[in-house]
Amino acid sequence: MDINMQKRNEVLAQNVIKGLESRNMSGYYAADKEAAVKQALELIPEGSSIAMGGCTSAHEIGLIKALEDGNYNYINRAKMSPRESLMAAYDADVFLSSANAITSDGVMVNIDGNSNRVSCIAQGPKKVVFIVGMNKVCSDLDAAMKRARNVAAPANAQRFEVKTPCKTAGKCFDCKSPDTICCQFLITRYSRHKDRIHVILVNDILGL
């Protein structure tokens, strides 16, 4: 990464972290993927039960492999029914996620189809750890919503066998298709419980 962009990301991340702290959430800056994994593991005690909500960013930095290789109870939802997976996630010690977008003052936006991810962010798991690439930082809530709807959601639709206009056109049509992956919008602007939500900002382009 260009050194000037790296410096810009570090400065911007500090502003985001200040915003998160003002919202009863914790923020961290990781200069690269390896530092992000190290920071995440410091937040996850050994022996913890860990669930995840389709977080490609956690895979990209190597965190999932580190958890599978370590002394953790990683809940593999691929081996469970949807209902079993959801109940296990609600009861997990740690829930891993990313954000579709985050504002420069620490507000996160997430869109979900089945809503398992946004429901676990809102309540249930004892701790939520976000892995967020600096490419997802937006100037304000309006920009964050636009990114979530017109960048993250159309890209996410490519992963599934769905028939939505965003999948074929690459932008949001505010559709009401039976296949829509945008059933729930979650704006996380404050955490009721201190030390529950932790956001690791990674100096990289991650996720969708």
Could you describe each region identified by the protein language model?
Residues 9-96:
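N-terminal active-site beta-alpha-beta segment that forms phosphate/nucleotide-binding
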Residues 90-208:
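Conserved phosphate- and dinucleotide-binding cores of soluble alpha/beta proteins
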Residues 3, 25-27, 134:
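Short, flexible active-site loop motifs that bind/organize anionic cofactors or intermediates
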Residues 1-9:
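Glycine- and acidic-residue-enriched helix-capping/strand-helix junction motifs
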